């Protein structure tokens, strides 16, 4: 769905583990890494689109995750001119995104990049929370920064809990 301003409705998905690290995925056949994301279909809510994209891109189902947060508003980024398809109607100049922060409840073995037979990603890894802001393609950085800042109060306490848990397990002689 492309709105009257030329922005395509889209959902972005940040999956964190119990340590507060986030899933970082490499686009199939490319050297670029990003969070899972995808378009919102006509008549579909943002949450419905998120669950559909979650399965299509990383093979996870609703029972594998828990929604921790979603962005208060839609965030936009413009595509560089070289990526705008002028021959398509209506012309899409960028994306407007509703973001979801999910916590993986199941084993990471549930992640299946080939769940739908046409993978969007060919590799993934856990990275530190702020890592994606510096590493994502430049035209998405502002949105990533805003999303990560908004979700930080929810995610960063997970890192503190994990750190405290590890400390309690250490013994001094």
Swiss-Prot record:
Keyword rRNA-binding: no
NCBIfam families, A to Z: PRK00714.1-1 (NF001934), PRK00714.1-4 (NF001937), PRK00714.1-5 (NF001938)
BP term (GO), one: mRNA catabolic process
Renumbered ranges of motif Nudix box: 38-59
PROSITE patterns registered for this protein in UniProt: NUDIX, NUDIX_BOX
Organism placement in taxonomy: Bacteria, Pseudomonadati, Pseudomonadota, Gammaproteobacteria, Alteromonadales
Coiled coil: none
Source taxon at top rank: Bacteria
Protein name, UniProt field: RNA pyrophosphohydrolase
CDD domains in UniProt: NUDIX_Ap4A_hydrolase_plant_like (cd03671)
Any one GO CC term of the record: cytoplasm
EC identifiers of the protein: 3.6.1.-
Example of a GO MF term: mRNA 5'-diphosphatase activity
One Pfam family hit: NUDIX
Species for this entry: Shewanella piezotolerans (strain WP3 / JCM 13877)
Ranges for domain Nudix hydrolase: 6-149
Cofactor: a divalent metal cation
Swiss-Prot/TrEMBL keywords: Hydrolase
The family this protein is said to belong to: Belongs to the Nudix hydrolase family. RppH subfamily.
InterPro entries xref list: Nudix_hydrolase, NUDIX_hydrolase-like_dom_sf, NUDIX_hydrolase_CS, NUDIX_hydrolase_dom, RppH
Its biological purpose: Accelerates the degradation of transcripts by removing pyrophosphate from the 5'-end of triphosphorylated RNA, leading to a more labile monophosphorylated state that can stimulate subsequent ribonuclease cleavage.
């Amino acid at each position: 769905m492309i709105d009257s301003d030329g922005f395509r409705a889209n959902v972005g998905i940040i999956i964190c583990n119990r340590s507060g690290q986030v899933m970082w995925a490499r686009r199939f056949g490319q050297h670029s890494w990003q969070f899972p994301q995808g378009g919102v279909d006509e008549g579909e809510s943002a949450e419905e689109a998120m669950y559909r994209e979650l399965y299509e891109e990383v093979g996870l189902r609703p029972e594998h995750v828990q929604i921790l947060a979603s962005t208060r508003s839609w965030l936009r980024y413009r595509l560089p001119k070289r990526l705008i398809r002028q021959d398509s109607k209506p012309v899409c100049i960028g994306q407007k995104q509703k973001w979801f922060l999910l916590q993986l409840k199941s084993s990471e073995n549930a992640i299946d990049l080939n769940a739908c037979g046409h993978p969007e990603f060919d590799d993934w890894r856990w990275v530190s929370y702020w890592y994606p802001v510096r590493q994502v393609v430049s035209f998405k950085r502002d949105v990533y920064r805003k999303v990560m800042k908004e979700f930080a109060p929810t995610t960063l306490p997970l890192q503190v809990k994990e750190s405290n848990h590890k400390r309690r397990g250490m013994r001094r002689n």
